[in-house]
Design a protein with these regions (language model features):
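Chalcogenol-based redox active-site neighborhoods
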Residues: 1-164, 168-172, 179, 186
């Protein structure tokens, strides 16, 4: 497991369209996922201990964001041939087990992860209503540990600002996680 950190937010960068299959059997595009006040696009997977440790907290925050007009979508771009736990069938199981309140999509070609510049799981891209990037940071300050009563909810707070003002915070702390497992181009 290689620990990676996300780069700084490239404020204003436009979201890139996609057309990917979801664990629900539907094809999803960016337009299908857009929220009235913003959109949270997340690169996650099933096997990464960083993602596993935040799963419940992430869902809690996504539900709060839905209440204020921000929709979320998760994309899995790892190579399932090398990481079978990230197979589409296992994605379906995880989505059902946690009752994901967002589409969980597979990027089998890895083209979408490359287009977005995603580097790790989790990697969060928070967009305003105009689909301009405003947040590229961590979920919270707990990392892989259980949150304390005074934990800072970076993602939630940033996306509330995005919903209210269209702008994310200037100071953002990178997300940390496992590197995306790229296919060998042999």
């Amino acid at each position: 497991m290689v620990l990676m950190k996300t780069p700084i937010c490239n404020f204003g960068e436009k979201a890139i369209d996609f057309n990917l299959p979801g664990t629900d059997g539907k094809q999803w595009s960016l337009d299908d996922c857009v929220g009235e006040k913003g959109t949270l696009l997340m690169f996650i997977c099933n096997h990464c201990p960083y993602v596993k440790s935040i799963q419940t907290r992430l869902i809690d925050d996504v539900l709060k964001l839905m209440d204020i007009g921000i929709n979320s979508v998760a994309i899995m771009s790892n190579d399932p041939d090398d990481y079978p736990e990230d197979s589409f069938e296992n994605m379906q199981k995880v989505a059902a087990e946690y009752n994901f309140p967002f589409p969980y999509l597979i990027d089998e070609s890895q083209e979408i992860a490359k287009a977005y510049g995603a580097i790790c799981t989790p990697d969060f891209f928070g967009y305003n209503a105009a689909l301009e990037l405003q947040y590229r940071g961590r979920l919270d300050d707990s990392g892989m540990k259980p949150p304390s009563n005074n934990s800072k909810h970076d993602l939630l707070e940033a996306m509330i600002d995005v919903a209210n003002t269209g702008n994310g915070p200037k100071h953002q702390i990178p997300s940390m996680g496992c590197s995306i497992k790229w296919k060998n181009s042999a």
